[in-house]
């Protein structure tokens, strides 16, 4: 594949991955999950890289232009997006992060409705759309246009989920327990 690798679409921000790419990923996904009498719902998270803000906005613009509603977690972790996709029955999730790559890189990782990496066949279709090798996607009109919602409460739900995983106290650790979700730049 041209853009998607082993874990999403990664590249140097505004060099090999730009807002036009992000917008088109959003347009494709918003259309791909459309079904009769179904409002597409997508949850988006990002790490703390500066370019994450522009990619979040571009993805949300593409998704809403295709009729999807966007739930923005803002700064969070990849596991939280995967968890919330499954728990809240989102059509998909998107994590904006390049993981361990340098700070000037970024990436778009699409998570399917089961909380796993998007299937390669769908990533190939996204690439064809980005390169103009597939049919144009119609714009949503009037009340079909999607909306963006602040969904920072989703991060709280994920933290509660992590806390619920620990049923018994850790002997010798005292009353303080710290959960650390290892993530570069977060």
Regions found by a protein language model. Give the residues of each.
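A generic structural signal for well-ordered alpha-helical segments enriched in polar/charged residues
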Residues: 28-31, 61, 65, 128, ...
């Amino acid at each position: 594949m041209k853009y998607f690798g082993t874990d999403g679409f990664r590249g140097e921000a505004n060099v090999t991955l730009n807002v036009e790419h992000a917008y088109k990923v959003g347009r494709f996904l918003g259309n791909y999950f459309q079904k009769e009498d179904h409002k597409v719902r997508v949850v988006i998270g990002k790490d703390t890289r500066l370019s994450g803000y522009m990619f979040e906005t571009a993805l949300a613009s593409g998704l809403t232009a295709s009729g999807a509603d966007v739930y923005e977690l803002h700064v969070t972790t990849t596991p939280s997006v995967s968890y919330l996709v499954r728990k809240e029955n989102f059509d998909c999730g998107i994590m904006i992060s390049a993981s361990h790559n340098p700070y000037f890189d970024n990436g778009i990782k699409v998570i399917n409705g089961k909380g796993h990496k998007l299937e390669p066949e769908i990533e190939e279709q996204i690439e064809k759309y980005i390169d103009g090798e597939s049919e144009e996607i119609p714009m949503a009109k009037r009340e079909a246009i999607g909306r963006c919602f602040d969904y920072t409460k989703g991060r709280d739900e994920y933290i509660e989920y992590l806390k619920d995983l620990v049923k018994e106290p850790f002997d010798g650790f005292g009353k303080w327990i710290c959960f650390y979700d290892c993530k570069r730049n977060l």
